[in-house]
Amino acid sequence: MVYRIYVEKKKQFADEAASLLSDIRSLLMIDSLEELRIFNRYDVENISEELFECCEKTVFSEPQLDNTYARLPQTDATVFAVEYLPGQFDQRADSCAQCIQIVSEGDKPTVRTAKVYMLFGKLAPAQLEAIKKYVINPVESREASLEKPETLNVNYNIPTSVETLTGFTELNENELQAFIDKYALAMDLADIEFCRKYFKG
C-alpha cells in the first residue's frame, strides 16, 4: 500500500514560496498571481501504517516549522506537481527512506517525492504555462500526476540493443552542437568536446 503525506512550511517560515512568488511577479510580470503555496509530497511503500504515522512528526516534518496534511487543502487554486525524471537521483527521497529505515530498524522502504505548487489568482492558460516553464527544469524533472499511484514499483523496458556511434571523434564544432541537439544531451559544447578528445586518445 502507498501512503501519502503533504508537508508545508508554516507561513512565517515559507521563504521558498515567498521568493518564488516574488520572482514570478517581477521576472515573468504575472501580477495576477496573488498567493503561492508549496508542499513537499511524500509517497511511501513497504512500511506499516503505524510506522508511517510514527514518522509524520519525526522524519517527514519538523512540528515547529511545518504543517502536515493527509490531503491537499480544498481551495479554488490552480495546482500542479513536479517530480524528478526516472533515473534522476532524488536526495530528499533517499534521505527520507534512510531515516525511516533507522527508525524501524528494518528494510529500507520505497519513497517518491514531488513538489506541489498551489497558485491563487486568475491565471490565463499562457501565464500558467509560463510559470510551469519557469519552475520545471526539463533536464531533470517533469510535471507529476496529482493522483496517488497503486504502487511505486516501476517497470522499465530494457533495450535489447544499444546504438553504436561511428565517427564521433571526427565531428567538428558545428557537428558536435548538432549531435547535442539530436540526442537532447544535458551538456554544453565544451563538455562534448572534452569527451571527443578523450575517446580520440
PLM regions with names:
Residues 1-201:
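Core nucleic-acid recognition elements
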